[in-house]
């Protein structure tokens, strides 16, 4: 007989969903519900599984009188009122390492796309042009990569960048222990010394607009900036201005402060030839989604003791 009700509100890997359904202790429903509908069922739910699409607000948590676990399939918790969950004694689970290789690979892909004008070259060639001189790029070899955040993803990026012959410096107040040849520096030093800067931090009050007009002014002329972390960590209006001015050589963006990026500021930014962009797909690989799903389900089972 089912002891717990699990509601999967955002798509989860099929194998992971099946593992949930195979547990006789669980009654599992899997359907995306908008807030009004979710509020109707949440009083009966013990475990709520979400990705980034569902905003688990304070009122949803308050209504979840049986809620024991909020399980986030992925890394970021900015769509969950974690403080409210803590006040209610609700466990918040996530999978910080499961998607790290996929996000790191995309970060490297964006660096290469920016340095070698890959997106622009593709469009140009498909238009029947042959613009070899206009598409002269930069090597990664010998360049300094500054990583803002050196957790799971930052370390995976470092491993790959080292294989390209890059020097790695990193800013992370926690200074995680590592065997990688990485030098920890303060933020100002990172801005001044980096040829490439890649962000790998959550969105918090201390990281909001960590890249802004003032920080860009400290950077090398021709810096390349990549963001596969969270929208809001870059002041995108300032980034637009500095790409136009040439201070920033190019930017590779997988995340935006407004998603989808349809407002005027984001449209202007995306109109630039030397901005390469993807629609928040850092963890969107079959392998990452399987790891995320399986790891999350195992954590749910452990927390419920089943």
Swiss-Prot record:
Reactions this protein catalyses: (R)-glycerate + NAD(+) = 3-hydroxypyruvate + NADH + H(+); (R)-glycerate + NADP(+) = 3-hydroxypyruvate + NADPH + H(+)
Broad class of enzyme this protein falls into: oxidoreductase
InterPro entries with a match to the protein in the record: D-2-hydroxyacid_DH, D-isomer_2_OHA_DH_cat_dom, D-isomer_DH_CS, D-isomer_DH_NAD-bd, NAD(P)-bd_dom_sf
Keyword Secreted: no
PROSITE patterns per UniProt: D_2_HYDROXYACID_DH_2
Binding site for NAD(+): 152-153, 172, 228-230, 254, 280-283
A GO biological process held by the record: L-serine biosynthetic process
UniProt GO molecular function: hydroxypyruvate reductase (NADH) activity; hydroxypyruvate reductase (NADPH) activity; NAD binding; phosphoglycerate dehydrogenase activity
UniProt xrefs under PANTHER family: D-ISOMER SPECIFIC 2-HYDROXYACID DEHYDROGENASE FAMILY PROTEIN (AFU_ORTHOLOGUE AFUA_6G10090) (PTHR42789:SF1)
Function: Involved in the degradation of L-serine via 3-hydroxypyruvate. Catalyzes the non-reversible reduction of 3-hydroxypyruvate to yield D-glycerate.
Protein family according to the UniProt entry: Belongs to the D-isomer specific 2-hydroxyacid dehydrogenase family.
Name by which UniProt lists this protein: Hydroxypyruvate reductase
Species this chain originates from: Thermotoga maritima (strain ATCC 43589 / DSM 3109 / JCM 10099 / NBRC 100826 / MSB8)
């Amino acid at each position: 007989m089912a002891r717990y009700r699990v509601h999967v509100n955002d798509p989860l890997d099929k194998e992971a969903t099946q593992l949930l359904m195979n547990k006789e202790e669980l009654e599992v429903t899997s359907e995306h519900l908008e807030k009004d509908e979710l509020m109707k069922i949440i009083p009966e739910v013990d475990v709520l599984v979400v990705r980034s699409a569902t905003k688990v607000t304070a009122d949803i948590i308050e209504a979840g009188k049986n809620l024991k676990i909020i399980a986030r399939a992925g890394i970021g918790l900015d769509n969950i009122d974690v403080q409210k969950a803590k006040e209610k004694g609700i466990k918040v689970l996530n999978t910080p390492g499961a998607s790290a290789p996929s996000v790191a690979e995309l970060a490297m892909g964006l660096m290469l796309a920016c340095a070698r004008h890959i997106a622009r070259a593709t469009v140009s060639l498909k238009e029947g042009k042959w613009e070899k001189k206009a598409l002269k790029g930069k090597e990664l070899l010998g360049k300094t990569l500054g990583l803002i955040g050196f957790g799971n993803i930052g370390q995976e990026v470092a491993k790959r960048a080292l294989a390209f012959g890059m020097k790695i410096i990193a800013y992370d107040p926690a200074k995680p222990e590592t065997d990688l040849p990485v030098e920890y520096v303060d933020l100002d030093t990172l801005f001044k010394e980096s040829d490439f800067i890649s962000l790998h931090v959550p969105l918090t009050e201390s990281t909001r607009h960590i890249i802004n007009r003032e920080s860009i002014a400290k950077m090398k002329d021709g810096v390349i900036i990549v963001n596969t972390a969270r929208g809001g960590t870059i002041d995108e209006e300032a980034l637009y201005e500095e790409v136009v001015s040439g201070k920033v050589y190019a930017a590779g963006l997988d995340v935006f402060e407004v998603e989808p990026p349809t407002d005027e500021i984001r449209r202007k930014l995306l109109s630039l030839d030397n901005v390469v962009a993807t629609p928040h797909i850092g963890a969107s690989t079959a392998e990452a989604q399987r790891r995320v799903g399986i790891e999350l389900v195992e954590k749910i089972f452990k927390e419920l003791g089943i």
